[in-house]
Swiss-Prot record:
PANTHER family: 50S RIBOSOMAL PROTEIN L15 (PTHR12934), LARGE RIBOSOMAL SUBUNIT PROTEIN UL15M (PTHR12934:SF11). This is Large ribosomal subunit protein uL15. The gene is rplO. Belongs to the universal ribosomal protein uL15 family. Binds to the 23S rRNA. Signal peptide: none annotated. It comes from Shewanella loihica (strain ATCC BAA-1088 / PV-4). Part of the 50S ribosomal subunit.
Length: 144
């Protein structure tokens, strides 16, 4: 198989519409745009969400909620991912070195998902009850 022998499957690509090429084509004269009006003009049309001057739904509905700025710098780590960290001590810098969290992360929480076989010491990270039980069952410990 070579790149120059590849071609699309039969019926996968349809021919482009050739508009304004006579009435026999079915797309002549007005080219499928109907008669007059804003949408028939070149560059015509209205922006997304415009309702003809009526107060748009987006503005009629109330604002709600916000984006927590702390959530942007907080990561969630699975128990199964702790095995990917080199060494026995797991802290934020160890997670960054193992590429489990990005450089901008300032807080991390270990959650129960998967299993861990080897004992590790978790330092300076928040840990859920289930994750704490799994880490301690594997012989590890949690240091605040």
């Amino acid at each position: 198989m070579k790149l120059n022998t590849l071609s699309p499957a039969a019926g996968a690509k349809s021919a482009a519409k050739r508009v304004g090429r006579g009435i026999g084509s079915g797309l002549g004269k007005t080219a499928g745009r109907g008669h007059k009006g804003q949408k028939s003009r070149s560059g015509g049309g209205v922006r997304v969400g415009f309702e003809g001057g009526q107060m748009p739904l987006k503005i009629r509905l109330p604002k709600f909620g916000f984006t927590s700025r702390k959530a942007m710098v907080t990561a969630e780590i699975r128990v199964s991912e702790l095995a990917k960290v080199n060494g026995d001590v797991v802290d934020l810098n160890a997670l960054k070195d193992a590429n489990l969290v990005t450089r901008n992360i300032q807080f991390a929480k270990v959650v129960l998902s998967g299993t861990i076989e080897r004992p590790v010491t978790v330092k300076g990270l928040k840990v859920t009850k289930g994750a704490r039980a799994a880490i301690e069952a594997a012989g590890g410990k949690i240091e605040e």
